[in-house]
Amino acid sequence: MTPNAARLLKKYGVDKAIGENLVSFEELNMRRKDGTPVGYTPISRVENALGQPWWLVHRHHLHTGLVDVARTSGCTILTASRVTSLDYQSSHDGKVTVSTEAGAQHTFDLLVGADGVNSVVRKAIFPSIAPAPPTGNCAYRAIVPYAEIRKHAELRPLVEKLTMEVWMGHDAYIISYPISAGKDFNMVLSHHRDPPVHQVQEIDMQELRDEYKDFDPRIKKIVDMIPSAQRWPLLYVGPLESWCSPKKNVVLIGVSSAPFPHTY
């Protein structure tokens, strides 16, 4: 949650709903793949310049906080209601009818499609547009508890403070940062595959370990501690003619309208 997003979380009280699971961190450190430092940013400098905190958060905790605040603000949230189709054109009064997997229908004056890269709403408005990888870049995602890392003396200096670390290699990089009240060491491990990856894939863990065998021995040891992981595609959509329907009764926001491939 960069400072611009943190400002909005604070405005609506979502920061209080998430609580300690919004993690503050001290530094952003850039390294070569062998661990040699090449750049350093104290996060306080960024926060002071922008007047807002920079937080790290697991998406589960973010979603839970958003749901809690929405409910206390009077919103009705329906679960087990996966949308399968929508009709936004046939109503004479411009209303939108949504059908769900459970067979229910709901009618609205305005439908906001914030349903991600595989958006059902976007597909209804722009059926010919589909997410695709612009390159062979993709990422493993994994979590290792800080408590496990601290059992190894040679790794403790790397985790004695809460920091964001980046190891940069040729066609590969690793980003790590703390989440879950500073209890979990989250990793995004970028790499390339040919042909490009279109969907989340299960992987052989030895493949992941071999991918980073020449990296800094410290992060390599943490990589070897990963119990399981998946390969995630980094997808792009667009360009779209518009982010709304011709009648302006359906609008796309967020990743449903403009996903970007380089993200952690």
Question: What does each model-found stretch correspond to?
Answer:
Residues 92, 166-170:
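A short catalytic or substrate-binding loop motif that flags glycine-/basic-rich loops and adjacent residues
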Residues 151:
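Short, conserved charged micro-motifs
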Residues 111-114, 134, 167, 252, ...:
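Short glycine/serine/threonine-biased micro-segments
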Residues 51-53, 126-129, 160-164, 237-240:
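Short, P/G- and charge-enriched loop/turn segments at secondary-structure junctions
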Residues 136, 155-164:
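Rossmann-like dinucleotide-binding core of oxidoreductases
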